[in-house]
Amino acid sequence: MNLKLKYILIIFLIIGIQVRIPAQETILPAIQQQEQILKRNPEDMRALKELCFLYLHKADYHKAIEYGERLFKIGYEKQDYKFGILYAHIGLGQAYIMLGDSTAINHLGQAKLLAESEKNDSALCSIYNGMGLYASNIHRDYYSALHYFFEGIEATHRCQYQELEAILLGNISSIYYLKDDPTGLTYSLQIYELGHQLNSAYLIFIGALNASYMYYLLHEYDMIRLYLIYKKLNL
């Protein structure tokens, strides 16, 4: 996997439905908290879902799959398609993307059917994002990737979820970077502005970083320097 593809895969995978990515130092206590819940109730599907996504954040994809499979098993036993099975498919799909396993698209496809039937747009945002990453990072199909990311943008508008919109905009700008196409600058600047509107240092960072890549493609090196300074200072 080349450096550009690794960049988009690591930075922009939406894990679960939450975009407020936890700091590494907070992941272990969060994992321990959810494990305590499971000790009291081994069939607590919300704890299983949280553990699946926390291990995705921790980049322990095999552990994420372990909890995703447990969530799927219990969800199936309880016939809980709206939560258990849906989020099991999302978590498993994302974990398999990170492992470069084509099994991912089967899980994401099943999740898409369930989310559409329940009109769960916040879940669809994550699913479309995963499908876009699958298309770009496993098949190098940038056209399909953009299609999925824009579908995700439409879903964020329906559920009014600006943080997810910003992450999807980041993926769109990254695809244009992979194509050596500075068209992505427009989307990078939108992320940067959304980051300020939402007071999100993470989104400001991503917007500034992507903008600097776009200015590099445009050979506007003074703007690269400016946005790297902004990124450092969170301005």
Residue ranges and their predicted role:
Residues 2-6, 231-234:
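Intrinsically disordered, low-complexity polyampholyte segments enriched for Lys and acidic residues
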Residues 19:
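Phosphate-rich cofactor/ligand-interacting catalytic cores and adjacent structured alpha/beta frameworks
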Residues 22-235:
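A "functional boundary" signal
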